Design a protein with these regions (language model features):
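Extended, well-ordered alpha-helical scaffold/bundle regions in very large, multi-domain proteins
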Residues: 342, 346-348, 355, 381-425, ...
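Sensory/regulatory domains in signal-transduction proteins
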Residues: 122, 184-186, 484
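A glycine-rich, basic-preceded beta-loop-alpha segment at the flavin cofactor/substrate interface
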Residues: 188-189, 226, 250-304, 322-351, ...
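Ordered core of a single globular domain
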Residues: 455, 473, 489-565
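Flexible, small-/acidic-enriched active-site or ligand-binding loops
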Residues: 227-256
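Amphipathic, small/basic residue-rich leader segments at the start of a protein or domain
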Residues: 10-146, 156, 170-176, 349-352, ...
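Alpha-helix capping/hinge segments and adjacent helical runs
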Residues: 434-511
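A short core secondary-structure module
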Residues: 170, 174-233, 250
């Protein structure tokens, strides 16, 4: 094991000079905090320089985009193991990518999170030591992977409904991976057309018994850019409103034979001598042993939800920044009548404009009594143009920029706190606490919903600018993608509401109490009339979403207040 570890370190140094340098600095460990800050600053400069070169020109198509990511992966600037060893670096890398690629659309940043978090992260979470070591070879070759979870029938219930099967044959000592119907087809698989490997979620069948969803590492091709392996079919989901530099595929498996080594079996596997299903790591605590593989995959979804929240937040920040820069230099104008006796001249100009519109509407047969064809010309004759304030100072737009900035600062602070707590959990390889899980859900819900709302309002106030390419508005459907990615926000809202109904929040504020009691009273009234609890929840969907939003905003306020209190305490202690 020691020799393998040293060999891996030597290969790492040869494949990534930057990483080798960093490892040596860690071994020395003499520079302390300031040394780490300098190292991180240097990494950021190198990473941003790499992004500048890769994103200098937009990708021609999804293959071009995939090649760019392959180059980034191969550079070694970000390792798969950074997800647990240095998770702050992963989150920063993603945020920088969203900022740098703002004008080019969201495809590349989505591709990035699939490669590192969903594909690589799942192998780190569920794979054995050999499988995790092989990730390094994947990185060195610049191979791309995908994460095949969502199925056609399941929709937003990904993981809860899995029909793809993987059946173990003790006689053959192999699995058979099968898509039993079109409804079981994997759909919307990002990077699915170009992936060399795929983490596929399928029901594990052993001796006729279904052991639930497990993860399998499937070779889609023998080598990067090579033809698909036999009995694997893929197709394009079709053109999208944005992000067409990202391939979204459907995938089918027609009795694909897999070796035992394809099963990610860190926690659960098969005794190949007897063919029995076995649970490993029996030394773990009771709570840890009872986790399913889907529970463990959920750890990746927590990381992904924070990344999605940050991506949506960064997108709308960049959109508002760029739009305000335009609005600050965009002049507006006022009318000043040329003579004091010109009272009503502006009304006259308006009448002329209306008359011309009427003439055009009826084919121009009726001539205006003002004998003119241009309302703009007449208006110029009647009045003089006076420079007004910039567009950004128009009252409604000025107010929108102010509101957006206030929300931005609050969400910035909250996302920093959530990322910090999640990174601590990832480093310690601990399960996320209930409080952290709720905070991650609140971040995903509110960062995305606020971005959608503010972007829509901004579009209404900026005229033709919002219709132009290269403004960012053309990619705003990315925010809709964020709403449904890594856990549908509506599902997260319903879970938050159900949890609040089931267990009262000990830090409950008055608005949350009122909303919770209103929902409970409605549910009870419906049940008293003979309605099932499921139907009652469907009927009270408005009250449920209202409670969820209030609860989510209360979580943001609570976390920010707690962070402020901790910061103040640290300042007092430092003075002492």
């Amino acid at each position: 094991h020691f020799r393998k570890k040293k060999a891996t370190q030597r290969r790492l140094k040869m494949s990534s000079p930057y990483r080798a340098e960093e490892e040596e600095e860690e071994d020395d460990d003499a520079s302390g905090v300031s040394g780490n800050e300098e190292k991180n600053a240097r990494w950021r400069r190198l990473y941003e320089h790499k992004l500048e070169s890769l994103l200098k020109e937009p990708s021609v198509d999804y293959r071009h985009s995939a090649e760019k990511l392959s180059i980034l992966v191969k550079s070694g600037l970000l390792e798969f193991t950074d997800l647990t060893r240095n998770p702050e670096r992963f989150f920063l890398a993603h945020r920088l990518l969203v900022r740098k690629g703002f004008e080019q659309g969201p495809g590349f940043s989505i591709r990035f999170t699939v490669e590192y978090n969903l594909f690589g992260g799942t192998i780190l979470e569920l794979g054995n030591e050999r499988q995790k070591l092989n990730l390094q070879k994947v990185r060195e070759r610049g191979e791309l992977g995908c994460f095949a979870l969502t199925e056609k029938l399941a929709g937003v219930n990904s993981g809860l409904i899995v029909q793809t099967t993987c059946t173990w044959s003790q006689r053959e000592k192999r699995f058979t991976l099968k898509t039993p119907s079109e409804n079981a087809r994997k759909v919307w698989i990002s990077q699915g057309l170009v992936a060399t490997r795929a983490v596929v979620i399928a029901e594990l069948i052993v001796r006729g018994r279904n052991h639930g969803p497990h993860a399998f590492l499937v070779n889609m091709r023998k080598q990067r850019l090579g033809p698909l392996n036999p009995n694997i079919k893929v197709g394009d989901m079709g053109d999208k409103t944005t992000g067409n530099d990202l391939d979204n595929a459907w995938i089918e498996f027609d009795s694909v034979k897999l070796p035992y080594s394809s099963l990610l079996d860190k926690h659960d596997g098969i005794d190949v001598r007897t063919g029995a299903y076995v649970q490993k790591n029996t030394a773990l605590g009771m709570n840890e042993r009872h986790l399913t593989n889907m529970d463990r995959i959920g750890q990746r979804l927590y990381t992904g939800r924070v990344a999605v929240a940050q991506g949506a937040h960064e997108f709308r920040k960049r959109l508002f920044y760029k739009t305000k820069a335009f609005a600050d230099q965009k002049e507006t104008w006022n009318f000043s009548e040329k003579n004091n006796g010109g009272e009503g001249m502006m009304d006259k100009a308006v009448d002329i404009a209306a008359s011309n519109v009427t003439n055009k509407r009826f084919g121009g047969r009726r001539r205006s009594k003002y004998n003119t064809t241009s309302a703009e010309t007449v208006a110029t004759e009647l009045v003089s143009h006076v420079r007004g304030p910039p567009l950004s100072q128009v009252p409604q737009l000025r107010q929108l920029f102010l509101v957006a900035k206030q929300q931005e600062m609050k969400m910035d602070a909250f996302l920093v706190n959530v990322e910090r707590k999640l990174c601590i959990s990832l480093r310690k390889k601990e399960r996320a606490s209930k409080s952290l899980v709720d905070a991650i859900a609140a971040a995903k819900i509110l960062a995305v919903e606020d971005a959608i709302d503010l972007t829509h309002r901004l579009r209404q106030e900026t005229g033709s600018y919002a219709l132009m390419a290269h403004t960012g508005f053309e990619h705003s459907d990315f925010l809709i993608c964020c709403k449904f990615a890594e856990g549908d926000s509506r599902i997260l809202e319903l879970k938050l509401a159900r949890d609040r109904v089931k267990t009262k929040n000990p830090n409950e504020r008055e608005p949350e109490r009122v909303a919770r009691e209103k929902l409970i009273e409605g549910l009870r009234a419906d049940q008293a009339q003979g309605m099932t609890i499921q139907k009652a929840w469907r009927r009270r969907w408005r009250e449920a979403y209202e409670l969820a939003e209030i609860a989510a905003r209360a979580i943001v306020d609570d976390w920010n207040e707690q962070a402020d209190a901790e910061h103040n305490a640290e300042q007092i202690l430092s003075r002492l």
